[in-house]
C-alpha cells in the first residue's frame, strides 16, 4: 500500500508531530511518501501571479510535467493519505493551504463531466487528518470541515478519520494522556 503523508507539523517539540509519529506506526512496512512542508526547497510555493499564470496554462493544456504538480500527482496515486497539521487560528496553517491548492488540480486529482459534475481521479479511499490544539477546537471546526468537504466533493474519499488532541495548553493538562486518548479514541 502506498501512503502519502502531508506533514505541516514542523515546530520543534510539535505535539502534532508526536501524534503523527504514533499514527504512522500503523503503516510500518508500507511504502511511505512524505511532503514535508517545513522543507523550503520541496514545499509547494503559493500560487502568486506569475506561478498562477504558469499553473493555469499547464492545466489548460493538460501538461502536468512541472514539479509544481508533484503534490497533486502523489495525492492521486496514493492508496491512503495522512495529513498532520496544528490547529491554527480556527483553521489550517497557510503553507498547508498552499499545498492543498496545488493538490486540487483539475485533470490530476479530480475532473468535471460535461454536465459540470465533479468526479475523482484519486485512488485513495481513506484519509486521516491529525491535529492538536492548545485550547479546545470548536464544534464548527473550519480546519477539519475544509478537509472533509474536499474529500467528499472532489476526491470521493468517504473514509475520513479525524484524530485530534485538544486542551494541551490548559493548566495541569496531562499531555501524554491526551495524546494517547486522541490516538486510541
Regions found by a protein language model. Name each.
Residues 1-85, 90-101, 181-185:
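N-terminal beta1-alpha1-beta2 submodule of the flavodoxin-like/Rossmannoid cofactor-binding fold
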Residues 2, 31, 125-126, 159:
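Residues at the starts of beta-strands that form the adenosine-phosphate
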Residues 8, 37, 131-132, 165:
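Cofactor-binding loop segments of dinucleotide-utilizing enzymes, especially the Rossmann-like FAD-
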Residues 9-12, 134-138, 168-169:
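Short histidine/acidic/glycine/proline-rich micro-motifs that form metal-
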Residues 62-66, 108-113:
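Short gly/ser/thr-rich secondary-structure transition/capping motifs
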Residues 112-155:
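Short, glycine-/small-residue-rich phosphate/pyrophosphate-handling segment
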Residues 138-185:
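Glycine-rich phosphate/pyrophosphate-binding loop and the adjoining helix
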